Curated annotation (Swiss-Prot):
GO terms for cellular component: chloroplast thylakoid membrane; proton-transporting ATP synthase complex. It is found in: Plastid, Chloroplast thylakoid membrane. PANTHER family: ATP SYNTHASE DELTA/EPSILON CHAIN, ATP SYNTHASE EPSILON CHAIN, CHLOROPLASTIC. This is ATP synthase epsilon chain, chloroplastic. The gene is atpE. Pfam families: ATP-synt_DE (PF00401), ATP-synt_DE_N (PF02823). SUPFAM superfamilies: Epsilon subunit of F1F0-ATP synthase N-terminal domain. InterPro entries: ATP_synth_F1_dsu/esu (IPR001469), ATP_synth_F1_dsu/esu_N (IPR020546), ATP_synth_F1_esu_C (IPR020547), ATPsynth_dsu/esu_N (IPR036771).
């Protein structure tokens, strides 16, 4: 038995295919979803989506949003998403280093919050690459 997974951003469909299992980062922690999972709606945190296709695991960096799970259908609506295999490792590492530097230089509450969010997004992209290596 499989699940139909659809990952959408405002600009595109990132994934629309059958999967065996997913592990999703939510605002309350990670959840695993197998076929016949109880219906839920949840907020999606900035984090990694792990997707199992048979014996192979893929990763995707998700940048926060919402998910609806029910009747073996998973719909994830996020601000942005990238497959781990599509992320350039060098560019992701450079972005992470820049985000860390920007956080150190941040002045005031607003700049600190924005720098922390940028750092979380950058770390998630690097984690998505490292999870598939």
């Amino acid at each position: 038995m499989t699940l139909n997974l659809c990952v959408l951003t405002p600009n595109r469909i990132v994934w629309d295919s059958e999967v065996k299992e997913i592990i999703l980062s939510t605002n309350t922690g990670q959840i695993g979803v197998l076929p016949n999972h109880a219906p839920i709606a949840t907020a999606v945190d900035i984090g990694i989506l792990r997707i199992r296709l048979n014996d192979q695991w893929l990763t995707m960096a998700l940048m926060g949003g919402f998910a609806r799970i029910g009747n073996n259908e998973i719909t994830i609506l996020v601000n942005d998403a990238e497959k781990g295999s599509d992320i350039d490792p060098q560019e992701a590492q450079e972005t992470l280093e820049l985000a860390e530097a920007n956080l150190r230089k941040a002045e005031g509450k607003r700049q600190t919050i924005e720098a922390n969010l940028a750092l979380r997004r950058a770390r998630t992209r690097v984690e998505a690459i490292n999870a598939i290596s």
